[in-house]
Amino acid sequence: MMGKATRDAYGEALKELGAVNPDIVVLDADLSASTKTQVFAKAYPDRFFDTGIAEGNMMGVAAGLAAAGKIPFASTFAVFGAGRAYEQIRNSICYPKLNVKVAVTHSGLTVGEDGATHQMLEDITLMRALPNMTVVVPADAAETKAVIKWAADYYGPVYIRMGRAKCDDICPEDYTFNPGVSYEAVSGNDVTIIACGIMVAKAVKAAEFLKEKGISARVINMSSIKPIDEKAILKAAEETGAILTCEEHTVKGGLGGAVAEVLCLHKPVPMAMIGTEDTFGESGTADDLLEKYGLTAEHIAEEAETLIARK
């Protein structure tokens, strides 16, 4: 069932947490209407700081607030957060292990018509390489709220990757997030599809297509990219013998890379990755772009069948 965009759930979660924790502060870089931090800003204007189009400075301010005992959520589009402010995230937040939550929206191809300059497809790779950084890609609104709640209680840097478009509901409303723990959305024993973000819903749909052909596909929501759920990956490799990863992100160093690192060291099995290749995005509708770059349930099902043949 189609639910809210993860960015909408983010705004709601901030407002709810702001009511119970006066140490939570929110920063934005002139995009609060889009990131939905304006929901928090209207409720708690004295705890909201718009730094303007100066993302690096925003991260520095967030680091200072964290050093003073606050719990800052620094928000902007993924391309500006992970891209423009990378040095400040690395040196001012991760190096001293400060309690800053970098919460970005408008990630991946589903930014749509804004085109390649705004379609961040490399941020998971960049962020999971940073020491002390936890990287999370929630699949839906319920999981987003659970992740924000967890992040507010956890001490340390966290990168939370959210999207622009509405997405299907996957997790139950009472879902509890734990880092390094995945969620099995569909059980199966012929092949495992490991996905994150909006691709989880597409993987679930692909599993339905495969079921019609008598193929039992397991679907794992791997929202915690770092730390990753090694146990679930190795269990899936042992029980299904084939792993397919799906992400709205480059296959170079993202979810697919993280899963491959686990498999090659501990349990090599046939594996394939679905995501963008060595390319930028382009302008177009979200649906058209997902179709062009192979990020559809139909393509996932096709790749799963090809992968099974390699077992």
Predicted regions and their residues:
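Thiamine diphosphate
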Residues: 1-161, 166, ...
